[in-house]
């Protein structure tokens, strides 16, 4: 049996609707490309679903592991303190075990997007688009 992975795409949240739209679109793109991955979204504040609601949205999906991925470019107080506290993980141990449908599920907390060639390529692409 292959492990079924869940990805919880985490956003900050905003009063402006396009913030939620972007997080939702990124989650949809992940789900379309990686078919055996269940993708849900959750927000730190100002938007629904909350992170807790996002985790609960995995109920009934059969995932055995969830990876919470902050869709933030770099570390800050939210990624180092607020989100880990909500998820029940620490800086030293970025994983925990949660219960979903009476089963143990491992929850991992990933690094933010960070410095990566894909981010650099996207920044260059946006620069070229600005000149069109």
Model regions and ranges:
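Active-site-proximal alpha-helix that buttresses catalytic centers in soluble enzyme cores
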Residues: 1-132
């Amino acid at each position: 049996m292959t492990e079924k992975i869940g990805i919880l795409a985490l956003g900050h949240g905003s009063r402006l609707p396009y913030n939620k739209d972007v997080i939702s679109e990124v989650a949809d793109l992940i789900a379309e490309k990686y078919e055996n991955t269940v993708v849900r979204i959750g927000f730190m504040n100002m938007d629904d679903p909350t992170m807790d609601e996002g985790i609960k949205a995995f109920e009934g999906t059969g995932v055995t592991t969830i990876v919470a991925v902050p869709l933030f470019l770099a570390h800050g107080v939210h990624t180092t303190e607020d989100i880990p506290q909500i998820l029940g993980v620490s800086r030293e141990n970025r994983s925990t075990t949660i219960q979903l449908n009476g089963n143990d599920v491992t929850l991992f907390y990933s690094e933010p997007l960070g410095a990566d060639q894909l981010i650099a390529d996207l920044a260059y692409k946006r620069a070229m688009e600005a000149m069109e």
